[in-house]
Amino acid sequence: MLERLKDSLIRSPIIKRGEYNYFIHPISDGVPSIDPHLVEEISDYISEIADMNVDTILTVEAMGIPVANALSLKTGIPLTIVRKRPYFLEGEVELSQSTGYSKGVLYINGLKKGDRIIIVDDVISTGGTLLALVRALQTIGVEVMDVISVIGRGDGYLKLRELGVEPKILVTIDVGEKGVEIKDVFGNQ
């Protein structure tokens, strides 16, 4: 189960950013090259475990796009991308997000009250982006049926529980100076 993903995570190079051990992986960083078989493995697994009775697959620009797009192609469900710049379309919703390493503004377009969506993200660590996104979607009246993160690091996912959302994290990891350690795989509980 998710053997390509687990193997690729274990082989991820680690760099230091200050005191932070940062793993470099195709799903979270786009480097090295993104293996289409890896993306296929991930999207196949998501389609099996997620509530796919939705109107739209939603992801945040940029690194959630490869997996969310593969899932959209596999299921025929449209894909909506939350962007980092405004388009000034009618109904555009602006939200501020803050993570452990950045702050910014995101823009949601094309969703309306009553839409049922699944969120697909590459990594959840602090939970800042997903927390702001889910709050904004709930304010609009969009039903968040599922939140999927390919990789989980830390306990930021716990913040989503406060909003009544239980994210599904495919692979939970720890990152140390010596490398990535697989802590859990969704479905092994």
Curated annotation (Swiss-Prot):
Cited PROSITE patterns: PUR_PYR_PR_TRANSFER
GO annotation, biological process: IMP salvage; purine ribonucleoside salvage
Q: Which reaction does it catalyse?
A: IMP + diphosphate = hypoxanthine + 5-phospho-alpha-D-ribose 1-diphosphate; GMP + diphosphate = guanine + 5-phospho-alpha-D-ribose 1-diphosphate
Name any one GO molecular function.
guanine phosphoribosyltransferase activity
Keyword list (alphabetical) reads: Cytoplasm, Glycosyltransferase, Purine salvage, Transferase
Question: Quick one: a GO cellular component term?
Answer: cytoplasm
* Keyword Transferase in annotation: yes
- Pfam families this protein is in? Pribosyltran
Which Enzyme Commission number(s) are listed?
Answer: 2.4.2.8
Where the protein is mainly located, per its record? cytoplasm
Please give the pathway this protein is involved in: Purine metabolism; IMP biosynthesis via salvage pathway; IMP from hypoxanthine: step 1/1
Q: Where in the cell is it found?
A: Cytoplasm
Member of which family? Belongs to the purine/pyrimidine phosphoribosyltransferase family. Archaeal HPRT subfamily.
**Assembly and oligomerization:** Homodimer.
**Alphabetical list of NCBIfam families matching this protein:** HPT_Archaea, PRK02304.1-4
What's its job?
Answer: Catalyzes a salvage reaction resulting in the formation of IMP that is energically less costly than de novo synthesis.
Protein's UniProt name? Hypoxanthine/guanine phosphoribosyltransferase
Q: Native species of this protein?
A: Methanosarcina mazei (strain ATCC BAA-159 / DSM 3647 / Goe1 / Go1 / JCM 11833 / OCM 88) (Methanosarcina frisia)
The lineage, from the top, is: Archaea, Methanobacteriati, Methanobacteriota, Stenosarchaea group, Methanomicrobia
